[in-house]
């Protein structure tokens, strides 16, 4: 999955130190989450081959239910009367931004414009300009100025490990197909800036309720209790919004007709051992594909004859005319 994260240690977009700050910062994160139109991003930059994420858990894994939290984020989306799911309006995002203390994108106390920083893991270049412009456009919709702090990847990693990042783009390719391997990305003890970089929680997100429930869920066998725990964990991070959850890429693949059990996947990387080949079908298909096709050669010969025969006749006619002219000149 690909997501847009907030550093929980940052005073503006992070957790906050007081109850008032926590509520303000949370509403700011929620406003940004609504403004980030991932449906548009998918159509422009992923050619439609992805699905918007409502939480950290992708479809297809245990714990993902179409009627559960993983499939619907009520903080960012709403359901229409006919049951369709749509992103909440920009007006709703602006309302949350005002409640966070930034009406129109300005600090209500100082009048200063709100400027946030995207720490990007590459220097700005023509190949990334369109994408970075798109991110700035999303923030501008609610009046926030987004500055791009591009740098090389090593420097970016140093900033994340030291906790000096504010907003960032990140992604995760699971090690194994289990909800634990996605939900641990938000487990407090895995905070990257607090573990010297060994943890995978790049947002440094920490919530005691989430951490306690996750520590129990990770060792549960698949069943109703684990499914309910996963559902509750997703609800917690939807409310806290440490990420705008981004999108899950769609898998695609092409297989010959003699390959069986071939299935597109984003997670399983040792899938070759599960494939079954039909050698007879393969040999038959190869023979069919390599069967000589003579009609193009015949057409070529006929066309060549239509061109060459008249050309030869014309050449001989000119030679005879030249010979007669030479004889008359001699006489």
Question: Model-predicted segments: where are they?
Answer:
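Bilobed periplasmic-binding protein-like "clamshell/Venus-flytrap" ligand-binding domains
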Residues: 43-46, 100-122, 168-171, 219-257
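Periplasmic binding protein-like
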Residues: 118, 137-193, 229
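Alpha-helical transmembrane segments
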Residues: 303-318
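Structural transition elements
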Residues: 51-100, 122-131
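Cytoplasmic C-terminal tails of single-pass
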Residues: 320-331
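Extended ligand-binding regions for polar small-molecule ligands
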Residues: 10-43, 210-227
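Structural recognition of the beta-strand scaffold that forms the well-ordered cores
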Residues: 2-7, 34, 43, 55-56, ...
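Short, solvent-exposed loop/beta-turn-alpha elements that line the ligand-binding surface or hinge
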Residues: 4-24, 63-90, 105-114, 159-163, ...
């Amino acid at each position: 999955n690909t997501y847009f994260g907030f550093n929980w240690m940052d005073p503006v977009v992070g957790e906050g130190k007081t109850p008032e700050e926590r509520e303000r910062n949370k509403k700011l994160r929620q406003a940004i989450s609504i403004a980030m139109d991932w449906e548009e991003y998918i159509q422009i930059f992923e050619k439609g081959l992805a699905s918007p994420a409502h939480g950290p858990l992708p479809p297809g894994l245990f714990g993902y239910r179409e009627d559960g939290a993983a499939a619907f984020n009520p903080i960012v989306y709403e359901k229409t009367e006919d049951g369709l799911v749509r992103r909440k309006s920009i007006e709703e995002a602006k309302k949350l931004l005002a409640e966070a203390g930034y009406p129109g994108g300005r600090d209500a106390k100082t009048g200063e414009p709100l400027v946030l920083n995207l720490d990007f893991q590459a220097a700005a270049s023509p190949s990334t300009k369109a994408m970075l412009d798109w991110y700035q456009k999303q923030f501008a919709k609610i009046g926030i100025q987004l500055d791009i702090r591009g740098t090389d990847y090593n420097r970016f990693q140093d900033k994340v490990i030291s906790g000096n990042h504010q907003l960032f783009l990140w992604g995760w390719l699971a090690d194994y197909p289990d909800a634990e391997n996605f939900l641990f990305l938000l487990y407090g003890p895995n905070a990257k800036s607090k573990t010297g970089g060994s943890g995978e929680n790049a947002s440094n997100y920490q919530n005691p309720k989430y951490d306690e429930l996750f520590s129990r869920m990770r060792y549960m066998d698949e069943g109703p209790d684990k499914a309910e725990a996963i559902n509750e964990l997703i609800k917690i991070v939807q409310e806290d919004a440490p990420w705008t959850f981004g999108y899950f890429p769609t898998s695609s693949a092409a297989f010959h007709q003699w390959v069986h059990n071939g299935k597109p996947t984003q997670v399983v990387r040792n899938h070759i051992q599960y494939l079954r080949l039909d050698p007879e079908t393969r040999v038959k298909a190869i023979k069919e594909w390599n069967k000589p096709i003579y009609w193009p050669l015949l057409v070529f010969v006929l066309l060549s004859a239509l061109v060459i025969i008249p050309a030869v006749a014309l050449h001989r006619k000119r030679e005879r005319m030249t010979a007669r002219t030479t004889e008359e000149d001699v006489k």
